Amino acid sequence: YQYMYNALQHNNGNGSFSNISQYTGMAATDWSWSTLLADFDNDGHKDVYITNGLLYDIRNTDADKQVAQYVSDFANDWVAKHPNAGDVKLFDILDIDKTIALLPSVPLKKYAYKNNGSMQFSKVSEDWGLDHASFSNGAAYADLDLDGDIDLVVNNINSPLEILENTQDPITHNFVGLQLVPTQDIPNTSGAKVTLFAGQQVWYKELSATRGYASASSQNIHFGIGKNTAVDSIAIIYPIGGKQTIKNVSINTYQEISALINSRIAPTKTDKNNTIGENSLHPEKIFNRFFTIITP
C-alpha cells in the first residue's frame, strides 16, 4: 500500500529534479486543491498557500460500506413493493440527497508556509490568520488595494467567497511591481520571462495568470526584494524572441512597462543528429483491451 503525499520538485539545474516535500515539511496538507507560491511578506522568498476541503469524503471506506448497504436495502425494498414495475433505473428512484448525507462532510483548515530561505519553511497558518476551516478549492492572488503586499481571493463551496487582505503593519520589506502593457510589436505579453537584478541577488518570474485549481491570478508582476533599496536592472524576454532591458526601476510602486524589444535573441540551434529521425520505428505491442483469456 502506498500512502499519498504531496510532491515538491526542486530543479537541480542539471536537467533533473528532486522531491523535497518531506524535507520542507509540506508533504501532508490533507485534501489540497489550489497551491499558490507568492512572496506574501516581501522578504524575497516565495511562500506557499494551500486551500483545503472536500465537501463529501468519498474516500471514507466506512461510509462507502454504509452507502452500499443503504442502496442495496433500498433497491430490495422497492422491488418488494413494486413487483410488476419492470426495468427501472436505480438513480430514477433513489433518494440521492439521503444517500450523499451518509458521507462525512467536515471542513478542513487551510495551510500557509513561510519561506525562510535555503529551502526551509515554517507553518504559519495560524500566525497569518489563514487556518480557518472551510470547503475551499479555487484561489487567486493579487494586490487588490495596491498597498504593496499580495492579497488572496478564495472560492468556498456552498458559502461566500473570501477576500483576505494582507495586513502587514508596518511593511518592513520593499517590493517592485510591474505591469507589462501590450503593444503593436508585442500584442500578448503572456509567457514573458522577467529577471530582476539587485546587488548580488537575482529574482525570476514567468508571466502566467493560471495558478491553483481552476483559477487565474493577477497579471501584474510582483517581486518582494527584502531590505534592498535599489534595483540594478530588469531583463524581460518575450516568447517571440525579443529582449527588453529596463534601468532606473522605482521601488515600492507599480510601473507600467510598454512591451518593447531592445534586442533580438538568436534562436537556439539543434543538432539534427540527436533528434528522432525517419528511421525511428515504434513497435506496437499487441494487446486485447477488452478480453483477457484466463487459463485454469
Where are these regions (language model features)?
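Short, conserved, GDST-rich strand-edge loop motifs in beta-rich repeat architectures
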Residues: 1, 54-104
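Beta-propeller blade signature
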Residues: 4-12, 111-115
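Beta-propeller blade termini
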Residues: 10, 33-42, 137-144, 296
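Residue-level marker for isolated small/hydroxyl-bearing positions within beta-strands
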Residues: 11, 49-53, 153-155
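Secondary-structure transition into beta-strands, especially the periplasmic turns and strand N-termini
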Residues: 12-16, 39-46, 116-120, 144-148
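Intrinsically disordered, compositionally biased low-complexity regions
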Residues: 15, 40, 53, 63-67, ...
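Outer-membrane beta-barrel proteins
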Residues: 23-28
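Gly/Ser/Thr/Pro-enriched helix-cap/hinge segments flanking short amphipathic alpha-helices
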Residues: 102-109, 115, 120-136, 140, ...
